[in-house]
Amino acid sequence: MRSKENKRVEFGAKVNNIQIDGISFIEHHSFEAFNEGTRLKQCVEYQQSLTGVPVTRIGMDTIYANNENRKYCTENSITTNFVRKGLGPKDEPAEISSARRIIGNLRATVMEGSFGNQKQHYGVGRIAARNRHSETLQLFFGIHIITVR
């Protein structure tokens, strides 16, 4: 069960998506609650296994901005849209702050927009399945059918 302030409660499976050039992939789904903020490393590894290309930039929701993920991104030279903790260095290049802003805006428009489309037009937000197997199939087709359009 998931909820957001001022939003209706959602039941059923919880899905952790990644997007590569606008195409959604299901990285993890479960009928048990999980914290997607702890799955950054798995998301990066999954994307690298799909594309064969090292990840250099990631746009993520604020739930991913924990210390462990910040350290992982720094160690692997991955630019993120995370807001800095504390005061930033005075000599930070304008390109870095500009990249953070662009990555954040792209994530917000593309990723959140795809969630809205999946829920509204492809039935992902509706309770239509009567068991876990049917719901898993509905999620798969609802998320992946948008790719072929």
Q: Residue locations for each model-derived region?
A:
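Basic, amphipathic alpha-helical segments enriched in Lys/Arg and hydrophobic/aromatic residues
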Residues: 100-149
